[in-house]
Amino acid sequence: MVNYPNGRSRAYSTVPKKKKSLTELSVTKKSTSKTKGMVAFGKRGMNFEAEINATNEYYLSRGLAVIHKKPTPIQIVKVDYPQRSRAKITEAYFRQASTTDYSGVYKGHYIDFEAKETQQKTVFPLKNFHEHQIVHMSNVLAQGGIAFVLLHFARLNETYLLPSSCLITFYYEKGGLKSIPLSHIRENGYKIETNHIPRIPYLEIVNKLCEVQ
C-alpha cells in the first residue's frame, strides 16, 4: 500500500504476471511492425510549407542564401509561476501575421515572399491573401526589395512563382474578382519544376527577377 499526500492510496498486486506465449509474442511483434509501417508511410509526404523550409535549409547549408520563416506572433493570456525562476505559459493564442511568411537575403538583395496552397484546379482564391500582406509587399517593392508569392496547386501538383507586382495589380485592378485564374498565373508567373534536392528550387527564378530589377 502506498499513501499519497492527497490522501489517496494504491494497493499493488503480488500475483505474478502471466508470461506471454510464443504465439502471443509473435502476434504482438507483427502488430507493432504494422503500426510502425503505417507511421513511416504517413511521414513520407511533406506539406508545401515543410518543402519550402527544407529548401531554405539546403540553400543555407550551401551558402547560397539566408532565408527563414517568420515566427507566428502569439498573444499570451495566462502565465503560471511554479517557481520564481521558472514561468509556464498556460494559455495563449496565435495572432494574425502582420507581414509575409518568409524573408532573407540573396546576393545582396532583400527577399520577401508569401507561400500559399489551394485545392482548386483552375483558380487561386484571393481570400488566401490579406490586404495588409499586399500592402507589405508593395512597401518592399518600393524600397527596392524582391517580393513574390509561391503558389501551389495541390491537386495538379504544380507550383508557380508569381511576382508580387502581378498579384498587387490583380488584387486592386481586376474589378473585385475573388480569384486569380490559373491561365493568368501561367502567363505572368514562372512554373517551378520540383526536384529531389532542393525540393522547390525557387532561387533559379529569383535570379531572373534580380536581373530585371
Curated annotation (Swiss-Prot):
Similarity section: Belongs to the RecU family.
Protein name as annotated: Holliday junction resolvase RecU
Needed co-factor(s): Mg(2+)
GO molecular function: endonuclease activity; magnesium ion binding; nucleic acid binding
GO cellular component labels: cytoplasm
Binding residue positions for Mg(2+): 99, 101, 114, 133
Highest taxon listed in the record's lineage: Bacteria
Organism: Lactococcus lactis subsp. lactis (strain IL1403)
